[in-house]
Amino acid sequence: MLTKTIDTEAWSDRYRNEAIDVPGRRVLITNFIGTEQEHDLSEPANCKGFGRVRHFHRRRSTNWLANPLPIDPACRALGMGNAATIRAQVFQNAVCNWRCWYCFVPFNLLNANKRHSSLLTPAELLDLYLADPEPPPMIDLTGGQPDLTPEWVPWMIEELQRRDLTKTVYLWSDDNLSNDYFWRYLTDDQRAAIKGYRNYGRVACFKGIDRKSFAFNTAADPALFDAQFDLFRRFVEFGLDMYAYTTFTTPDLDGSRAALSDFVDRLQRIHPLLPLRTVPLEVTVFTPVQSRIDSRCEAAMANQYVVASYWQEELVRRFGASDFSKNICDVNMK
């Protein structure tokens, strides 16, 4: 784990400069061959090493809550009915401005490492994707932190449109809510293209339930925990199809019940129904995580199950049975 607090603005600026070629419309994409992350892939890397196929499962653990993301939004958009799993073609940008100790990506794949990445255009990525004998119905733009290179999404949308793939491919991206680059660097037309693209969904991750757990998880300034809510609110008010993840790892449980209640309050101040579009993620140990874990991390992984029980209690207190029976896509925040 990092012991010094990350200068998020400085890291964001540095990694953006290394990870995007705006005139050439290229983004720095990880190549998984020969990396530590390759050991955790359920299938060999594809797309000449620049891609991986991920199988999203609604329920991976009997000890944790079901996760309908991105299965339900993708199936709804593509008319695929209900499903327990979905295959996705994953492309991973090679930079991140935070260092979450539980991240399944090795830290040396988050620092614009040119030994394991190359600058590629969306056209080149789609060429690789379409060369697969069975291209998955969904493309997942992940990282890293994709929003250090926010142009990646509208560029990919343009390329999908050019190839007449808009009705057969669902596009998904994630965001760690660490910067305002969506607003700072995209043009009005690019933002409008994202908003107007029917088969696109976006998930953003809240990295803890309070400032203490946030700083512990990310190594970032605790004040940026509050900024996460402001950034998410802007996306909702803009009209994107937004979903949320959250992690419940906290180094101790002192005050955690009250902190969790306040966390849900803050979600509801963005929109009263946002907790129903928020999915807690279970933190487990992937290969790169093993060398980072100390006693505080072990405690945090145990504590997440207690906090998850508080989460369930809060939702039962605030919502009715009819709310819980809804498909997550039918929780309307617009």
Locations of regions flagged by a protein language model:
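Conserved alpha-helical substructure of the radical SAM core
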Residues: 106-139
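Conserved AdoMet/S-adenosylmethionine-binding subsite of the radical SAM
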Residues: 126-130, 147-277
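Short coil-to-beta-strand
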Residues: 92, 96-101, 198-204
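Glycine-rich beta-strand-to-loop/alpha-helix junction loops that act as flexible
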Residues: 141-145
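Short strand->helix junction
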Residues: 110, 146-147
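N-terminal [4Fe-4S]-dependent radical SAM core
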Residues: 13-92, 101, 105-110
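Acidic/glycine-enriched edge-of-secondary-structure segments
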Residues: 103-115, 215-222
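Auxiliary Fe-S-binding modules of radical SAM enzymes
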Residues: 1-47, 223, 230-334
